[in-house]
């Protein structure tokens, strides 16, 4: 494998090596070479006072073999855009960053670092601004964003040729989101709604205000039907809507009642300020009674079991972790290894799990000409391994 600068020049057999005069030769007998890993759902944030702690996460990703991250919006969008530029220019050490910039939300949302939109005209202005920043995709969340404006944002983004990622509003079905052109669904638990024959009924009740989202989730779990799930996932695949599972972060939160993370070795790599942002989920989970805890467990397990069905129905599974601030004990770097380990545990093959972390991310972003394999013209983002990851 011949490298020049940040690119692979050629992949040749030994007999062809005499055509080249390398300045340096690295011999790796008995080792395995593969493309760098991608974590396609990370966050940087916690306020301006935590910029330095977030910046320290960049080499941590590299130390775990993660050469590319997709930033799904925190509350430091301008800082991340600057890092993207500096890393691309070779001025900052870190993984290649693809970012959404600030996410779209409704008026006065829970989340910080958002562009608040309340009218179609404001959606237009927001997308104008994001395009001017040359963001890599548009992130949309549903805390206070009106469902009709969510669909409007997807429509306008698709007209502009902008890729989209988002959460699923409780007032809309997955079919509606796929029809509107949503590129990736972030967090696999959202798919549970589409696994019941009662999806439309439950969605309508939530939209009418006669049922809460949590109640609808409980009803969805109780009325799970695999043929319905397969039909829904085939629909997503046909529309080109992918899934970023973020299973590891979901698992950590689901089992906070059973597992003590206060002595995790990975905590030593997380700054004190970022560690403090973990508290809110821990404190919220501590207030759950036995029934709520049981639902947390059931929701995670049922969600995770959908993974092989998604694969079988042709949905593109893109590895992402939700690592970063706020998401308790979901450690940048390590989390991706835990994530793809769960993919195998819940039914994917090692090869499929690796494809989710190497090939499917660049495919979503239209970057397979540069990433996803060890081949001429691709980025020289390479990992050297002691063992065969396919085994």
What are these regions (language model features)?
Residues 1-34:
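Histidine-rich, glycine-flanked metal-binding segment
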Residues 13-15, 301, 331, 349-354, ...:
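Acidic, glycine-enriched loop/beta-strand segments at the rims
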Residues 31-91, 109-110, 115, 121, ...:
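Metal-associated gating/positioning segment near the N- to mid-region
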Residues 102, 106-163, 210-223:
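Active-site gating/metal-coordination segments in enzymes
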Residues 126-141, 191-346:
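Active-site neighborhoods of metal-dependent hydrolases
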């Amino acid at each position: 494998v011949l490298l020049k600068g940040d690119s692979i020049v050629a992949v040749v057999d030994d007999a062809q090596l005499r055509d080249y005069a390398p300045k340096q030769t690295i011999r790796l007998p008995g080792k395995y070479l593969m493309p760098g890993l991608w974590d396609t759902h990370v966050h940087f944030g916690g306020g301006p006072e935590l910029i330095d702690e977030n910046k320290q996460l960049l080499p941590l990703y590299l130390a775990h073999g993660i050469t590319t991250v997709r930033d799904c919006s925190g509350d430091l969008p301008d800082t991340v855009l600057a890092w993207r530029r500096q890393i691309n220019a070779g001025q900052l050490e870190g993984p290649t960053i693809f970012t959404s910039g600030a996410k779209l939300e409704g008026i006065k949302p829970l989340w910080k670092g958002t562009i608040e939109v309340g009218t179609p005209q404001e959606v237009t202005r927001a997308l104008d601004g994001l395009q001017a920043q040359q963001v890599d995709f548009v992130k949309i969340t549903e805390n206070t964003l009106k469902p009709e404006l969510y669909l409007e944002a997807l429509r306008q983004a698709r007209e502009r040729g902008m890729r989209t990622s988002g959460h699923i509003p409780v007032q809309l079905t997955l079919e509606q989101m796929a029809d509107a052109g949503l590129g990736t669904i972030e967090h696999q638990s959202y798919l549970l709604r589409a696994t019941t024959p009662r999806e439309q009924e439950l969605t309508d009740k939530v939209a009418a205000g006669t049922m809460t989202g949590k109640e609808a989730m409980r009803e969805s779990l109780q009325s799970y039907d695999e043929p319905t799930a397969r039909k829904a996932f085939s629909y997503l695949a046909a529309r080109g809507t992918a899934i970023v599972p973020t299973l590891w972060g979901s698992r950590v939160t689901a089992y906070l009642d059973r597992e003590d993370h206060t002595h995790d070795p990975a905590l030593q790599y997380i700054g004190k300020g970022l560690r403090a942002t973990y508290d809110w989920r821990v404190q919220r989970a501590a207030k759950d009674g036995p029934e709520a805890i049981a639902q947390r467990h059931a929701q995670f397990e049922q969600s995770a079991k959908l993974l092989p069905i998604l694969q079988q129905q042709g949905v593109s599974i893109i590895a992402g972790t939700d690592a970063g601030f706020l998401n308790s004990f979901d450690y940048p770097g390590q989390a991706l290894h835990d994530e793809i380990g769960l993919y195998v545990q819940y039914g994917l093959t090692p090869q499929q799990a690796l494809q989710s972390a190497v090939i499917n991310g660049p495919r979503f972003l239209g970057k397979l000409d540069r990433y996803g394999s060890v081949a001429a013209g691709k980025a020289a983002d390479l990992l050297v391994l002691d063992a065969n990851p396919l085994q």
